């Protein structure tokens, strides 16, 4: 029953947020296009529920041609970030197009962040912990408890804790904590 309620909540909330944020998202898309060559959106291959690969949209914050790896694995990440990209990442505005993924059911508002398709160690650890059964989220328990600063075992432990304890009240708490962290720009390293 919880999963059905969560899906309905996700759908309605994503629809409302897209309606409210539609114009600002169009402005962001225009700024991305004006400040660097290429499309406004970047579709990243991510690992979803039950390890199914899906395309996750983000506002493009890196130059076209950047290798599709986690930012911290790039030799010089700052050389790949567009003029507006650093701001988009620090403010988490680059994540807004993921509301589309929530709307179509590839993601949830709250759940473990979807791994990149080539993060084999994270994918294996999550599968071993049963976390792969969850729909990935725009935010999650690991996001509000360390975000980019956490090593993989700690992320997976927090994801597994969310799997065991998930509830509507925990989701609301995570959403509130996320809003607070975004406003304070906590835990963003790139």
Residue ranges and their predicted role:
Residues 1-64, 101, 168, 173-190:
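A hydrophobic, helix-centered structural microdomain
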Residues 47, 97-190:
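Hydrophobic structural segments characteristic of membrane proteins
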Residues 39, 67, 74, 88, ...:
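A helix-centric hydrophobic-segment signal that preferentially recognizes long
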Residues 1-4, 76-80, 95:
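Juxtamembrane loop-helix boundary motifs flanking transmembrane segments in multi-pass membrane proteins
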Residues 18, 72-76, 132:
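Residue-level "hotspot" positions that anchor or transmit function at local structural transition points
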Residues 40-80, 138-157:
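Short, glycine-rich, amphipathic interfacial segments at transmembrane boundaries or analogous
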